């Protein structure tokens, strides 16, 4: 019998609620930009669950006014996306900050080139994946486990060969706690606003949101208590 098979629906609901998390700030090459700066922060830490909704692009219901800052990031630079339990960022001791450790799933980062990173319309963009942290069978550790251990810091490098210009940076933590069927997976995501400087002229092929994820994708519909190997949803990670 599965260890968790006896959990009540109430307990599952409680875990689902406490697993909530929000990407709400950025650090670029060691410089913390501050809470809500250059990030479209949703006012709620509730997840997106409908992968066919436009909410799967950058979320919805943003704290107003939305930041007009576009963060300068050199190609090849290091970015940290900071997650916390609430939209306000770190607000003091909280056993569920940055997310409840019962949350299990991958953490991923995408970019989409845009004319203006502050534009309100985010539909029709082409997204390419630049980083992911999925599941390590040898240690039975998920990307979300590392996110918790690292205090909500998802750290990755901007590819050095990318064409300079403005981009939206989509970072998400996916909870697979109740993902044995669709809908079940929960998507916690926001979009940062960056301007990549330097670099080269590479424009990677992108995918659509909605569209990149499907209701039958084993990266979205899975049993975390019986997982052997795991491939996160979406395209392969781009590399120069």
Curated annotation (Swiss-Prot):
GO biological process, alphabetically ordered: cellulose catabolic process
Glycan-modified residues: 153, 195
Record has Glycoprotein as a keyword: yes
Disulfide bond residue pairs: 58-191
Xref: InterPro entries: AA9, AA9_LPMO
Cellular component terms (Gene Ontology): extracellular region
Induction data: Expression is induced upon growth on hardwood pulp.
Compartment(s) of residence: Secreted
Residues involved in (1,4-beta-D-glucosyl)n binding: 32, 62, 67, 153
Record-linked CDD domains: LPMO_AA9
Signal peptide: 1-19
Highest taxon in the source lineage: Eukaryota
Keywords assigned: Carbohydrate metabolism, Cellulose degradation, Disulfide bond, Glycoprotein, Polysaccharide degradation, Secreted, Signal
Claim: Repressor is one of the keywords in the record: no
Described purpose of this protein according to its UniProt entry: Unusual lytic polysaccharide monooxygenase (LPMO) that may have a hitherto unidentified role in fungal degradation of lignocellulosic biomass in conjunction with other secreted fungal enzymes. Binds polysaccharides but does not have the active site of two highly conserved histidine residues coordinating a copper ion (the histidine brace), which are essential for LPMO activity.
Family: Belongs to the polysaccharide monooxygenase AA9 family.
Record's protein name: Unusual AA9 family lytic polysaccharide monooxygenase B
Gene: LPMO9B
